[in-house]
């Protein structure tokens, strides 16, 4: 890290660490951003040593700027970092990244005006491409520098590691900046595997070439002296054109950017291949119950990049599906943030959801709510013993018990009022529902019938003495009525049919 961090001196490092990442934000640039930019430049086959000077930063910006329209967020972050570092080298006072980009744009506009003024002064109105790999030598001739093995190695490594994931497309666009059709074919021929994907790419190129020929028919008549023939679809694909013709078309006045046209065809075919290698629809990307929100967002945007849709449709998918397909915990948090929340706010709010810390917080909040509700119910008296009134056995008043009674202690039993024993030893019985003490010490229990019903059949005839004898039941009934005058069911239920 030390070699990469030595890009800035002491004073430059102080100015670097005062610049904010976003206008009005709290985060500022640190050494780790320079280290990150160096590693990304190595991935893009660019010498990271160019960061040490303002001239090198200008060269890096010149290579990255054409790819900003089709590049990824990572490529834009790299461009912003290099632009800020350029302002530090040039001692341009900026407060944040946006001001640095504005300064770079002002310098580029000034340089363009100067170039146009110089061309007008010399009378040369032709705009000659100075982009690599087509450069102008000392004699003023446009020459081509072949694509470097290092660039080819980086491209092959990306294909081997990423196959045809969505990030392959911006990587191809960055490595093929300013390339001729011959350079692009060299990059495609270095891909050893994935021949099925390469065949799909060839079919897409042939379709686009046929469409080009249909929209750009050949003009009848001979070609004027000093002019070049118009390129056909096969010429743009590099199959029927030479390298000199390709350079001539790209540097002609007006130019025909055959390299850029061919690269658009290739990127169109790569989009179809990426779609085939990523069969998962964006509608199927859902956050797992224990999946961190950051991993879910990574999967969501990776699948979104493979979707063949316009930017407006992708923006709608992001605003709707990102929240809709989150798990219940994160969905509750995201809905509370509102529809205007940024991705950074969402990531910060859902950080740690699903982990042990989040579960512990949820459990603690639930326990605190239960405890608070129980305390409130106890304070209001809304508990189980709410309906029972406490009564003192000593003084007979409600609201306290005998243990806490302030009145003089009553002598004797609190139940029967007699002295000589306590309430726990009292033998006084409670009356049953018939109003009698149960069990009865005399005869049958009080809840039994106290009289027997008379039989409806005539009495048995006596053949011994010829006179009727009194039955025992008839003698027992008056005796029972004398012993239990209130035990008849007539006293409880009105007329008793058994006594009639």
From Swiss-Prot:
GO terms for biological process: viral budding via host ESCRT complex; viral translational frameshifting. One of its GO terms (cellular component) is host cell nucleus. A motif (Nuclear export signal) lies at residues 16-22. A zinc finger (CCHC-type) spans 390-407, 411-428. Residues 8-43 are annotated as: Interaction with host CALM1. The record marks 132-133, 363-364, 377-378, 432-433, 448-449 as: Cleavage. The modification Asymmetric dimethylarginine is found at residue 409. SMART domains: ZnF_C2HC. Residues 217-225 are annotated as: PPIA/CYPA-binding loop. The modification Phosphoserine is found at residue 148. It comes from the Viruses. Residues 7-31 are annotated as: Interaction with Gp41. GO terms for molecular function: RNA binding; structural molecule activity; zinc ion binding. A lipid is attached at residue 2 (N-myristoyl glycine). Residues 12-19 are annotated as: Interaction with host AP3D1. Pfam families: Gag_p17, Gag_p24_C, Gag_p6, zf-CCHC. Late-budding domains (L domains) are short sequence motifs essential for viral particle budding. They recruit proteins of the host ESCRT machinery (Endosomal Sorting Complex Required for Transport) or ESCRT-associated proteins. p6-gag contains two L domains: a PTAP/PSAP motif, which interacts with the UEV domain of TSG101 and a LYPX(n)L motif which interacts with PDCD6IP/AIP1. HIV-1 lineages are divided in three main groups, M (for Major), O (for Outlier), and N (for New, or Non-M, Non-O). The vast majority of strains found worldwide belong to the group M. Group O seems to be endemic to and largely confined to Cameroon and neighboring countries in West Central Africa, where these viruses represent a small minority of HIV-1 strains. The group N is represented by a limited number of isolates from Cameroonian persons. The group M is further subdivided in 9 clades or subtypes (A to D, F to H, J and K). This is Gag polyprotein. The gene is gag.
């Amino acid at each position: 890290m030390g070699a990469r961090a030595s890009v800035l001196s002491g004073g430059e490092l102080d100015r670097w660490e005062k610049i904010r990442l976003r206008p009005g934000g709290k985060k500022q640039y640190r050494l780790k951003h320079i280290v990150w930019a160096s590693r990304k430049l190595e991935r893009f086959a660019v010498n990271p040593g160019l960061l040490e000077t303002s001239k090198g930063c200008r060269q890096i910006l010149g290579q990255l700027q054409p790819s900003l329209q089709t590049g990824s967020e990572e490529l834009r972050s790299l461009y912003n970092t290099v632009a800020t570092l350029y302002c530090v080298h040039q001692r341009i006072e900026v407060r944040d990244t946006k001001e640095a980009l504005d300064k770079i744009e002002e310098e580029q506009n000034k340089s363009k005006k100067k170039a146009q003024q110089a061309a007008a002064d010399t009378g040369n109105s032709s705009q000659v491409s100075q982009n690599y790999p087509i450069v102008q030598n000392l004699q003023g001739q446009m020459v081509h520098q072949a694509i470097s093995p290092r660039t080819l190695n980086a491209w092959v490594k990306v294909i081997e590691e990423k196959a045809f994931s969505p990030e392959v497309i911006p990587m191809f666009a960055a490595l093929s900046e300013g390339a001729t059709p011959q350079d692009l074919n060299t990059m495609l021929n270095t891909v050893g595997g994935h021949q099925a994907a390469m065949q799909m790419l060839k079919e897409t190129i042939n379709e686009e070439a046929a469409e080009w020929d249909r929209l750009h028919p050949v003009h009848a008549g001979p070609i004027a002296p000093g002019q070049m023939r118009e390129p056909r679809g096969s010429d743009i694909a590099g199959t029927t054109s030479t390298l000199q013709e390709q350079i001539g078309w790209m540097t002609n006045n007006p130019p025909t950017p055959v390299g850029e046209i061919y690269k658009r065809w290739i990127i169109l075919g790569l989009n179809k291949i990426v779609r085939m290698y990523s069969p998962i629809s964006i509608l199927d990307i859902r956050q797992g119950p224990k999946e961190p929100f950051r991993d879910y967002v990574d999967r969501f945007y990776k699948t979104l990049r493979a979707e063949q849709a316009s930017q407006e449709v992708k923006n709608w998918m992001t605003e709707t599906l990102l929240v809709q397909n989150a798990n219940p915990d994160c969905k509750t948090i995201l809905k509370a943030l509102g529809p205007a929340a940024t991705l950074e706010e969402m990531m910060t709010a859902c950080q740690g959801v699903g982990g042990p810390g989040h579960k512990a917080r949820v459990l603690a909040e639930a326990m605190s709510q239960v405890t608070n509700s129980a305390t409130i119910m106890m304070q209001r008296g809304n508990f189980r013993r709410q309906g029972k009134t406490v009564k003192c056995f000593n003084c007979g008043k409600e609201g306290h018990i005998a243990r806490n009674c302030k009145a003089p202690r009553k002598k004797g039993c609190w139940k029967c009022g007699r002295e000589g024993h306590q309430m726990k030893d009292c033998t006084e019985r409670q009356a049953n529902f018939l109003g009698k003490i149960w069990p009865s010490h005399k005869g049958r229990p009080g809840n039994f019938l106290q009289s027997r019903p008379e039989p409806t059949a005539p009495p048995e005839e006596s053949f011994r003495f010829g006179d009727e004898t009194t039955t025992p039941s008839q003698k027992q009934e008056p005796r029972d009525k004398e012993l239990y005058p209130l035990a008849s069911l007539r006293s409880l239920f009105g007329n008793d049919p058994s006594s009639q």
